[in-house]
Amino acid sequence: MSQEPPARPDPATLSYEQARAELVDVVQRLEQGAATLEDSLALWERGEALAARCQEWLDGARDRLARVSPASGGATEAPAPAERDR
């Protein structure tokens, strides 16, 4: 019998902060090692979905920053501190 709540929101509907907070909880629960194999697999699957949602948000934020920062020449990464200080 699973210990997961029966009605969890679809990860696609979660904000970055909501998905990340739940992902942190999932990881902590898995690290405790107290769940059954079935529950652990369900937690793992939920964690994968939450991690994918977080990555979608991060990719979208990176794209958005690249669009509004024409001075960067479309670069999506800042120069390393050593290169910036030259």
Swiss-Prot record:
It catalyses: Exonucleolytic cleavage in either 5'- to 3'- or 3'- to 5'-direction to yield nucleoside 5'-phosphates. One of its GO terms (biological process) is DNA catabolic process. Residues 67-86 are annotated as: Disordered. Its EC number is 3.1.11.6. GO terms for cellular component: cytosol; exodeoxyribonuclease VII complex. InterPro entries: Exonuc_VII_S, Exonuc_VII_ssu_sf. Bidirectionally degrades single-stranded DNA into large acid-insoluble oligonucleotides, which are then degraded further into small acid-soluble oligonucleotides. PANTHER family: EXODEOXYRIBONUCLEASE 7 SMALL SUBUNIT. Heterooligomer composed of large and small subunits. This is Exodeoxyribonuclease 7 small subunit. The lineage of its organism: Bacteria, Bacillati, Actinomycetota, Actinomycetes, Micrococcales. The gene is xseB.
